[in-house]
A protein has these predicted regions:
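Bacterial N-terminal signal peptides that target proteins for export
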Residues: 1-11
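Post-signal-peptide N-terminal segment of Sec-exported extracytoplasmic proteins
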Residues: 28-30, 37-77
Length: 108
């Protein structure tokens, strides 16, 4: 009985950790001539137009756009300033295609 409880606890913790942490590798990496601010101003309305509810934040000199999910881990776009504009990292974690990455590509 103890083994079953310990296994269930370990599995539950693993699932929760996957929701709370960012993966090491982005799903998509893009370069843009736009600044992070210009990119965010483009992508947020596109996500809203796809019935998503993006949350924009600006931690430590970059922009982060998060789309919360009740079923999977949150989808995240991070836009950083680069020498020729910006660098964009897309972390699309939903199981089915949602148009999240496509919106980022359209704003490059």
């Amino acid at each position: 009985m103890r083994t079953v409880f310990a296994s269930a606890t370990l599995i539950a913790c693993s699932l929760l950790a996957g929701c709370a942490s960012a993966p090491n590798e982005p799903t998509l990496t893009l370069e843009t001539s736009k600044s992070p601010e210009q990119f965010a101003a483009c992508v947020v309305p596109k996500l809203q137009g796809r019935s998503m509810s993006p949350i924009l934040s600006q931690p430590q000199r970059h922009y982060r756009i998060t789309v919360p999910s009740t079923v999977a881990a949150d989808n995240v776009i991070e836009a950083y300033k680069a020498s020729s504009g910006g660098k964009v990292f897309v972390y699309e974690r939903s199981l089915m295609a949602s148009g999240f990455g496509r919106a980022a590509k359209e704003c490059v």
